[in-house]
Amino acid sequence: MRFSLCGFPLVFSFTLLSVFDTSLSATTISLTPEDSFHGDSQNAERSYNVQAGDVYSLTGDVSISNVDNSALNKACFNVTSGSVTFAGNHHGLYFNNISSGTTKEGAVLCCQDPQATARFSGFSTLSFIQSPGDIKEQGCLYSKNALMLLNNYVVRFEQNQSKTKGGAISGANVTIVGNYDSVSFYQNAATFGGAIHSSGPLQIAVNQAEIRFAQNTAKNGSGGALYSDGDIDIDQNAYVLFRENEALTTAIGKGGAVCCLPTSGSSTPVPIVTFSDNKQLVFERNHSIMGGGAIYARKLSISSGGPTLFINNISYANSQNLGGAIAIDTGGEISLSAEKGTITFQGNRTSLPFLNGIHLLQNAKFLKLQARNGYSIEFYDPITSEADGSTQLNINGDPKNKEYTGTILFSGEKSLANDPRDFKSTIPQNVNLSAGYLVIKEGAEVTVSKFTQSPGSHLVLDLGTKLIASKEDIAITGLAIDIDSLSSSSTAAVIKANTANKQISVTDSIELISPTGNAYEDLRMRNSQTFPLLSLEPGAGGSVTVTAGDFLPVSPHYGFQGNWKLAWTGTGNKVGEFFWDKINYKPRPEKEGNLVPNILWGNAVDVRSLMQVQETHASSLQTDRGLWIDGIGNFFHVSASEDNIRYRHNSGGYVLSVNNEITPKHYTSMAFSQLFSRDKDYAVSNNEYRMYLGSYLYQYTTSLGNIFRYASRNPNVNVGILSRRFLQNPLMIFHFLCAYGHATNDMKTDYANFPMVKNSWRNNCWAIECGGSMPLLVFENGRLFQGAIPFMKLQLVYAYQGDFKETTADGRRFSNGSLTSISVPLGIRFEKLALSQDVLYDFSFSYIPDIFRKDPSCEAALVISGDSWLVPAAHVSRHAFVGSGTGRYHFNDYTELLCRGSIECRPHARNYNINCGSKFRF
C-alpha cells in the first residue's frame, strides 16, 4: 500500500473506513471500568465470544490481567466470523499476563475470518504486557486477515511471546497508522517476527511520535522485530527506532530488525521494503546470525525524510561478509536516496570483526544511489558483493527531473583495526557519475566494473585512496584531489584498470581542493617542492590519455600562498607530479593575533580609571588626611565594523590610596591598585592579565586674581568676574597626576582545527596629566545644582607591549608594539550640596579629542618560515563624549562613602567605569 504525502487524508480515510464498516449491522457493547478483571487461582478464565461486526466501546479505563484460558482454548476476545472493532473513546485498555493455551493463536484477540478486519482506535493508552508471557504460546493479537491500530495515543506491547509468528501481532495485513503518541514494541519474541509478523502487506505510517522496536527477538527464525511475506511500508513517521533487536538462531536467523522475503515457490511479485519520508530513522545495535544485522530483504528502498542512521549493527556470519547493516538477497535490488536528510552507515560489522555496511548476494544490485543537494550518503563501512555483473548504475541519476547534486562518500576513517577489508567497497556494476560528488576518503578503495562521468559531476580523491575498474575502461571528466589529506598520507591517489588493454582517460583540468582550508597551513607548504599526488595505472597493454592542463587553478585561501604546476612521468603507468611554488603567507583571521595589540587599549583604560579615582578623591567633603579603599570596574567594548573585529576588555580590582591636605592650598595623594582583567576577540583568543598600578597626585589651589597679579608682576592689580551670580575673584585649582602600570599577560588561543596555544608576555603603561578647573557658585540654593566647575586637561598615555614567541611547531612571533595618545579633555561639572552638608552629588559632561595618537600595532611572523604580516589593533575614534556622576555621603567625622559611574562613547566603542569606596580619617 502507498500513502498520500499528506497525513490527514490517510488518517481520515482509515477513520471513515472504520465507521462505515461497523455501523451497518454492528452491535455496540460498552466496556466500563466495572468490566475490568483481575484473575486469581480460583477464577482465572475470561473470554468474550465476539459476534460478527461487534463494536466494543469503552466508557472508562478497562484493565484485564492474570487470565488463563488454557482450559477453554480460547483467546480473551474470540472472533469466529466477521470483523470486530475496539473504540477507545480516549480511554485506556490494559492487558497483562493473558494466556490462551499452546494451540490457540492470539491470547488477547483471535480473529479467524479470512475476510474480516480487527481494529483498535481512539485509545488514550493501549497496553499489552506478557500476553502471553510464555514462548510456548502463540502471540498476543492474531487476525487471519487485517489488523489495524488507528488514531490512538500511547500503544505499548511488552514481553509478548509466540512459538510461531509475531510475538505481539500476527496477521495477513497489518496497519499501524495515525497514532498521536509513542508506539513501542519491547522485548517481544517469536520464531518469525519477534514483534510483528505479516503474511501480506505491513504498513506503519503517519505516526506523530516515536515508533520504537527494542530488544525484540526472533527465536529459531528471522526478523527480530518485523517479518513479512508482503510489502513493508514505513512512511511519513516522526521518528522510527530499531534498537537491539536480534535474530541469532544458527543457520536461520536473518534480519536482526527486519526481514522481508517472498514465500518459497510463490508466484506473487517480490515484496518490497520501503522506508520513505520518515523525519528520523535509526537502526542501532541490531544483530543477526545469517546476514543483515539490521535488514535482510530481496528488494529495499530507503528515501530519507531526515537523518537516517545505521549504527553498530552486527551480522555474526562466520568468515563471511553478510551485511553488518543490510543484506540484499540473491537477485535483489537496493535503492538509497538522500532526499531530506543524510544517510549514514557507521560501525556496522561482521563477527570477524570487519566493518561491513551492505552486502549484495549473487546477482543483487544497486538500483539507485543518489543524494539531493546539501545531503549525502556516507559509507564509513564498506559495501561487499558476491555478484559479478555489469548492469548500469547512474549515481545521482535524475529519472524524474529532480536535482541530485549531493555527495556519495566512501571513507575508511572509522576503521579501528586498520584491516584492508575495512576499506574496500565493491559495486559490480557499470557506474556513471551523473551529477554531484563521489568522494573517496581516508584510504578507502572503491571497485566498480566500469566508471564514467557526466559533465558537471565531480570525483574527489584523498591521497592514499583508490578507484578501480575491474572489467572496463575509466573515463574521468571532473577530477579533484583533496590535499587536506597531505597531513595523513604521502601515498598518491590511484586510478586503476584491472583488465588488460583497458584505457584510462582524464580530461579537463584537475582541481586541488582543501575543504577545511588546513592544507595550506601544513608546514610542508612553506617550501617550494614536488608532490606525487596521482597515479594512473591501466591494465597490461592499456594506455593513459591525459588532456588536463599543466597549470592548476588555486582558489582563494588562507595559509601559504603559491601556484601549482603539473607534470607527468612514466610510460605505462603515469604519475602526476604536482610542483608547488610557494610565494608568501596569508594568515587566517583567527591567526592574525589582533588581540595582542588590542590589549594595549585595555591597559590605557585601566590606568586612566585609576587617575580618575584619585581626581574624584581630591573633591572630597573632607580633604584632610585619610585612607581610601575603593573597588573599581571597567568594561570596554569595541563592536565589529568594516575596520574592526570585536574586542572586549573587562577588569576589576581594588585601589588603596592615602591623601593629605598639607595646607589649604596644597593637597597630595598616592594610590596603589591591583586589577584583574579578561580580554577576548570573540574568535579564538582569550587573555587574562594581572596589573599592578601606582599613581601620584598633587593639587594646588589659588585665585584668579593671584594668577593675574603674578603674571603682571604687580601686586596691586585687582581682577575678577563682573557678575552678581559669581564670585568676583573665583578660585583656580591646578593638578598634576602621573601613573604607572605593569601587566603580566596569559593568553590562550583555542583553534578549531589545531591544538590550543598558550602565551605569556608583559606590558607597561605610563600616563601623565595636567589640568585646571574654576569652581563657580551659580545658584545659592539651586534645585538641580549649585556650582559649575569648567575644567580642561592635557593627558598623555603611553603603553608598551613586549615581544614574545610561541613554542609550537607552527608558532608565531610577535614584535613589540606601543600606543601613544595625547588628548585634551574639556568639560564642565555640576555640584549640589544638601542642606545638611552631609550629602554631595555631581554630574559632568566632557568632550575628549585626541590631538595626537599612534594606534597600537605589531608585526607577527611564523617562527619556522619567517613569513610576516602586520597586526593592527582595533581602530578607536579620536573623538569621545563622556558623562559621569558621583555621589558622596559624609557618614560621620571619620568616614565618607563614595560611588561614581561614567560612560565614554565613541563610534563603535563604549567604555563603562564604576568605583565605590570609603574614606577613613586618621
Curated annotation (Swiss-Prot):
Lipid bilayer topology: Peripheral membrane protein
Location of this chain's protein in the cell: Secreted, Cell wall; Cell outer membrane
Main location as per UniProt: secreted
One Pfam family here: ChlamPMP_M
UniProt KW keywords: Cell outer membrane, Cell wall, Membrane, Secreted, Signal, Transmembrane, Transmembrane beta strand
Keyword Hydrolase (UniProt): no
Domain Autotransporter: residue ranges: 620-922
Leader peptide range in chain numbering: 1-26
Top-level division of the source organism's lineage: Bacteria
InterPro entries xrefs: Autotransporte_beta (IPR005546), Autotransporte_beta_dom_sf (IPR036709), Polymorphic_membr_middle (IPR011427), POMP_repeat (IPR003368)
GO (cellular component) term, any one: cell outer membrane
PROSITE patterns: AUTOTRANSPORTER
NCBIfam families (alphabetical): POMP_repeat (TIGR01376)
Similarity annotation: Belongs to the PMP outer membrane protein family.
UniProt name for this protein: Probable outer membrane protein pmp1
